[in-house]
Curated annotation (Swiss-Prot):
GO MF terms held by the record: structural constituent of ribosome
Disulfide bonds: none
Example of a GO cellular component annotation carried by this entry: cytosolic large ribosomal subunit
NCBIfam families: rpmD_bact
SUPFAM superfamilies: Ribosomal protein L30p/L7e
CDD domains: Ribosomal_L30
Organism phylogeny: Bacteria, Pseudomonadati, Pseudomonadota, Gammaproteobacteria, Moraxellales
GO biological process: translation
Family statement: Belongs to the universal ribosomal protein uL30 family.
InterPro entries registered for this protein in UniProt: Ribo_uL30_ferredoxin-like_sf (IPR036919), Ribosomal_uL30_bac-type (IPR005996), Ribosomal_uL30_CS (IPR018038), Ribosomal_uL30_ferredoxin-like (IPR016082)
Highest rank taxon of the organism: Bacteria
Quaternary structure, from the entry: Part of the 50S ribosomal subunit.
Name of the protein in its database record: Large ribosomal subunit protein uL30
UniProt keyword list: Ribonucleoprotein, Ribosomal protein
Length: 59
């Protein structure tokens, strides 16, 4: 399965609860934190929801 590298570059503070939940679901905790997740429709949806807080690359 394909994987993608997701890096948080903006803070999740003072954001909508659903956006904070998406960051938590992706496993992101702080600025410059990077995780490698599988490229599934559910993770794509979480990334699209918080696309202004994260940057995505293929892993």
């Amino acid at each position: 399965m394909k994987k993608m590298k997701v890096t948080q570059f903006k803070s999740g503070a003072h954001r909508l609860k659903s956006h904070k939940a998406s960051l938590k679901g992706l496993g992101l905790r702080r600025i410059n934190h990077t995780v490698i997740v599988e490229d599934t429709p559910s993770t794509r949806g979480m990334v699209n929801r918080v696309n202004y807080l994260v940057k995505v690359e293929e892993a």
